[in-house]
C-alpha cells in the first residue's frame, strides 16, 4: 500500500463531512494467526481546521506523530491544564514529527486544510485504559 497524496485525498472528503472534522485510517494489515495478534497501533489521521482533539494522555504508552502533509501544532500540558510546550510540525519543514512521552497531556491542532499525520503507539489499544482526558 502506498501512503501517497492520492490515498490522503481519498480520505479527506470523509474527514470534511465528519462532525469531528477528522478521519483515521487504520494501517494494521497483518492477519492474526493462532498465538499471535497484531497489537500495534498505526494509523493515518486526516485533519481539517477546527477539529478538536480533546486534551488527553496515554498512561501506558508514548506516541509518535509525523506530519505527512500540511502542518499541525502539538501542545503539551501539565496536570493542571497549563501549557508547557508548543511545537509546530510541518511536512517538508525543519521539524515534521515528535515523540509524545508516556503520560504527558497533549493535543494536536490542525494548521492547514487536509493535513495528514501518522500516529503510532507502543501498546495495544485498550478502550478502558488507552486515554485519560484532562
Where are these regions (language model features)?
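Short beta-strand His + acidic residue motifs that chelate non-heme Fe in jelly-roll/DSBH
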Residues: 54-56, 74-76, 98-100, 106-111, ...
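Glycine- and acidic-residue-biased ligand/ion/polar-headgroup-sensing regions
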Residues: 60-80
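Double-stranded beta-helix
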Residues: 10-11, 82-88, 105-134
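Conserved short histidine dyad/triad with adjacent acidic residue
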Residues: 43-60
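A generic "binding-loop/recognition-motif" signal
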Residues: 51, 60-61, 104, 113
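A short, N-terminal "cap"/entry segment at the start of jelly-roll beta-barrel domains
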Residues: 1-39, 85-91
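Short acidic-glycine-tyrosine-enriched beta hairpin
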Residues: 78-103
Amino acid at each position: 500500500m502506498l501512503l501517497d497524496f492520492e490515498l490522503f485525498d481519498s480520505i479527506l472528503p470523509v474527514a470534511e463531512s465528519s462532525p469531528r472534522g477528522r478521519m483515521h485510517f487504520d494501517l494494521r494489515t497483518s492477519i492474526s494467526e493462532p498465538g499471535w495478534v497484531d497489537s500495534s497501533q498505526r494509523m493515518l489521521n486526516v485533519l481539517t481546521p477546527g477539529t478538536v482533539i480533546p486534551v488527553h494522555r496515554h498512561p501506558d504508552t508514548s506516541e509518535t506523530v509525523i506530519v505527512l502533509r500540511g502542518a499541525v501544532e502539538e501542545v503539551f500540558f501539565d496536570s493542571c491544564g497549563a501549557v508547557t510546550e508548543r511545537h509546530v510540525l510541518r511536512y517538508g519543514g525543519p521539524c515534521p514529527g515528535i515523540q509524545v512521552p508516556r503520560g504527558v497531556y497533549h493535543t494536536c491542532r490542525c494548521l492547514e486544510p487536509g493535513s495528514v499525520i501518522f500516529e503510532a503507539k507502543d501498546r495495544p489499544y485498550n478502550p478502558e485504559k488507552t486515554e485519560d482526558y484532562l
